[in-house]
């Protein structure tokens, strides 16, 4: 019998092969004395498989089965991982939304998803009632103590399904597996439709791209990524931190977990990498670091590499919720390309992960229904990055206009068709076949002299003394926009005539073609809620416009 196409299909096999290996280790209670987490809550592979089977049976008996769209609002905990694997085993469709997004946007996301079930902690159910989230959800499950809102509890369902036996739906690769909402860093979040083949493809590509092998110990600081660990046979140590605020993580607590459990690999956003870099403590057990969500600043790459063993690897995969991974680059290559990045070449995101096919097309803000409408650009030409491959998703849920704007239908030579995803990013290929990222398409600045791309301007100015980071925005109508550089300073620094002169001199020497004349110091850039690393340039553009009016 063929194994179903399902991310949970590997779990029963791992439960037989390595039943006593810890699959999930959670912080649990605070340890006595030093205030560190005890990490006394664990699940081994045998327990993860058996308990998720019981939950799946209980959920099925309650009416949450194959194809049922189910909102999941549960903090990183054993219950979160058990629940997610139970839903995958059932062939139900978990709906995941970042809890930190704007409340109105969150309500819109849940309304669009039209969920039939809602599973959450008590606080999530209170918010559901007060803010009228997901009124379509008829089946309610509480993770924890249920109060007066009806439904049942996850614990009760697990008890009810205790004798249900193995549970694994015969899911097909084309079946919907989940709806994962984007972070909404450049607009209202969109629900990305994941099919089972997309998750299975991600597992295969992540394993091959990074050489992940069963038995390793991972510290995933972005909870959804922890779901990949059990499918790869890894032990997942859930860090003692708020996953929605990686920039505020306590490096002492992270190091405590890394040292105590011999963590061999960790995943974190660039904001979390900066936390570890500033802390400056070596990471002797870590052989693989992966950072994604936004380009990692060159100084952070260099510092993290200096804290790792000499043979360790620091990977920065390029991709998006809609398609991941697309390309990967290792820290050594990033250090070699640092000078080019700081000279305005963009950020190297490395080699395309096979079997993805990445092509650069001419920038066009209009939808492209068919690939014949796209014009593929030559090596060195900046255009929109597109990708076709096993993890390229094909639609957004209940967002036909967004789907039309981001997806292109392509007919292949054998008559078959596939969907090409438009990344919404601009970039180019160099002569060595490496992909370079130049910024978001919607964040390009269209001046009278021509377009400017954020990642070809900002790194040039991030090297100026006293500057923490910069953000290029445009003020005015497209085609005649005035470029403005917003500047965030290092702690203890302040705006001054000397700083303004240094920025102007840098612009004249390094980017004369950009025509930059306005440098506005901003107290703290707005960033995305998922990785705390993507700069909210749309908000900064509004602020910059108002500032220029004041100074006119």
Swiss-Prot record:
Gene Ontology terms for molecular function: acid-thiol ligase activity; ATP binding
Disulfide-bonded cysteines: none
CDD domains cross-referenced by the UniProt entry: FACL_like_1
UniProt keyword annotation of ATP-binding present: yes
EC number of the protein: 6.1.3.1
Enzyme class, broadest EC rank: ligase
Domain of life: Bacteria
Coiled-coil regions listed: none
Annotated binding of ATP, by residue: 182-190, 316-321, 425, 440
Catalytic reactions on record: a (2R,3S)-2-alkyl-3-hydroxyalkanoate + ATP = a cis-3-alkyl-4-alkyloxetan-2-one + AMP + diphosphate
PROSITE patterns: AMP_BINDING
Alphabetic keyword roster: ATP-binding, Ligase, Nucleotide-binding
Recorded family membership: Belongs to the ATP-dependent AMP-binding enzyme family.
NCBIfam families cross-referenced by the UniProt entry: OlefBLtnSynXan, PRK09274.1
Subunit structure: Monomer.
Record PANTHER family: LONG-CHAIN-FATTY-ACID--COA LIGASE, NONRIBOSOMAL PEPTIDE SYNTHASE PES1 (EUROFUNG)-RELATED
Protein name in the entry: Olefin beta-lactone synthetase
